[in-house]
Amino acid sequence: MQMVSILLLALAVSLDSFSVGFTYGLRKMKIPFKAILVIACCSGAVMFISMLIGSFLTKFFPVYVTEKLGGLILVGIGAWVLYQFFKPAKDKEYLLHEKTLLNLEVRSLGIVIHILRKPMSADIDKSGVINGIEAVLLGFALSIDAFGAGIGAAILGFSPIVMSIAVAIMSSLFVSIGINAGHFLSKWKWIDKMAFLPGLLLITIGLWKL
């Protein structure tokens, strides 16, 4: 049963990768296999680090407290994602090149947050291909929302290694699928209607563990 929770959580925190890949595919941009591996490694590394932090926190609280806390963290993150989806339309950005993945203003994170808000900005050299440092920045940008979920997952007792591998595989898979889908589909508005799924999955997993 825990493996089901791990797969669902990995799915929830990796769906943004599909959205970004889809956006790039529509613009006929390319992400080489090596760059996809870099993105996967970044996603897995961020998840692993966040879960180590979560595991460290479990040493200071009783088991029954950590179980509730982990569930509440996932519910909270999921609720935030749903808020971003359902908030008034006037506050949203609908331009393709400014497809918003996370409405969060943290100036200290600079370019990472900028990439989250405008995925096309990850192509720093405007070459139409995501490579090198661009892949690293994109990988970390896609992992920001997974950081809190990783802490919650560790508190719930999930394996950091298994969870990190699952997220790495899911994120690379969804980026690849998104790019291919974007190449073949000219209409993309339907994908916006699915943006609530990560939040719903996180809330479901969190409530399941409460």
UniProtKB/Swiss-Prot annotation:
Listed GO biological process terms: intracellular manganese ion homeostasis; manganese ion export across plasma membrane; sporulation resulting in formation of a cellular spore
GO molecular function: manganese ion transmembrane transporter activity
Cellular component, GO annotation: plasma membrane
Induction per the UniProt record: Expression is regulated by the sporulation transcription factor sigma E.
Membrane topology classification: Multi-pass membrane protein
Subcellular location: Cell membrane
Consequence of gene loss (knockout): Disruption of the gene causes a 10-fold reduction in the efficiency of sporulation. Mutants divide asymmetrically but fail to complete engulfment of the forespore by the mother cell.
Keywords on record: Cell membrane, Membrane, Sporulation, Transmembrane, Transmembrane helix
InterPro entries, per the entry: Mntp/YtaF, Spore_YtaF
Entry-linked Pfam families: Mntp
Residues that span the membrane, as ranges: 6-26, 36-56, 69-89, 129-149, 162-184, 190-210
PANTHER family named among the record's database cross-references: MANGANESE EFFLUX PUMP MNTP-RELATED, SPORULATION PROTEIN YTAF-RELATED
Protein name per the record: Probable sporulation protein YtaF
Native organism: Bacillus subtilis (strain 168)
Lineage: Bacteria, Bacillati, Bacillota, Bacilli, Bacillales
Gene: ytaF
